[in-house]
């Protein structure tokens, strides 16, 4: 009998990645002679889906320099020294304990470098909580994320759920027949997530265990 799986996206739901994103922003903007945005302003722009090149132009870069800086940003966003800036949300250990009582935990993330991901998970002690880690490069589409899970060989049972912080997570979960939960603590605002009609929309993972338990009682 297939068990219930709770699949979590890493960046946003589990990790606060705003420091890493802002550090890379600072580096590439300064390299091209621009003026980086303050962290709060930069992160709010990212959460509101402002294009990276538009952000870079606001920082004083020419269109050509912005394109170059965006290419450099993509190369550097998973650099090991940058990944060290990521931090689990302070409540994660307690939430993991609650979730593990409700199903098997799987991590699903689009990352270009599996070796760097594994080192990061080990350094943060997160590898201990996940039965499976499903990761691979992607083009940022729901199809790419859904394909990762399809190829994983995991057989999930009724009530399994995908928890993420982007429209890609909601759409990929729906394509796989999973329940979908969107969280507003990551790289999208709740206002941008709501039109994608996730089954539930919460501020962060702390609300998910009670929601899953409520589903068990109905």
Tell where the protein language model's regions lie, with residue ranges:
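Glycine-rich phosphate-binding loop signature in dinucleotide/nucleotide-binding domains
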Residues: 101-103, 154-159, 215
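Short beta->alpha linker loops
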Residues: 87-91, 112, 165, 185-188, ...
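Short, acidic loop-to-helix structural element flanking the phosphoryl-transfer center
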Residues: 80-107, 115-118, 143-146
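Conserved H-loop
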Residues: 35, 127-131, 199-202
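Conserved Rossmann-like nucleotide-cofactor binding loop
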Residues: 13, 20, 113, 168, ...
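Substrate-recognition "cap/lid" segment bordering the active-site pocket of phosphatases
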Residues: 110-161, 167-171, 175, 192
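Acidic, Mg2+-coordinating phosphoryl-transfer loop and its flanking beta/alpha structural elements
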Residues: 162-202
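N-terminal helical cap/lid subdomain that shapes the substrate entry/recognition surface
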Residues: 2-90, 100
């Amino acid at each position: 009998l297939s068990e219930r799986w709770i699949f979590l996206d890493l960046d946003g739901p589990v990790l606060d990645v705003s420091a890493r994103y802002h550090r890379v922003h600072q580096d590439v903007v300064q390299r091209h002679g621009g003026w980086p945005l303050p962290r709060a302003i930069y992160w709010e722009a990212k959460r509101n889906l402002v294009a990276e090149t538009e952000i870079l132009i606001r920082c004083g870069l020419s269109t050509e320099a912005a394109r170059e800086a965006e290419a450099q940003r993509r190369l550097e966003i998973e650099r090991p020294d940058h990944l060290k800036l990521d931090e689990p949300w302070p409540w994660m250990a307690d939430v993991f304990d609650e979730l593990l009582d409700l199903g098997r935990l799987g991590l699903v993330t689009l990352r270009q470098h599996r070796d760097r991901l594994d080192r990061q998970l080990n350094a943060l002690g997160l590898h201990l909580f996940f039965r499976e880690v499903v990761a691979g490069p992607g083009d940022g589409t729901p199809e790419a994320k859904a394909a990762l899970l399809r190829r994983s060989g995991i057989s999930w049972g009724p009530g399994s759920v995908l928890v993420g912080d982007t429209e890609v997570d909601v759409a990929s979960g729906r394509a796989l027949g999973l329940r979908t939960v969107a969280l507003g603590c990551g790289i999208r605002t709740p206002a941008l997530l709501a039109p994608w009609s996730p089954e539930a929309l919460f501020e962060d993972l702390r609300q998910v265990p009670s929601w899953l338990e409520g589903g068990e009682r109905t």
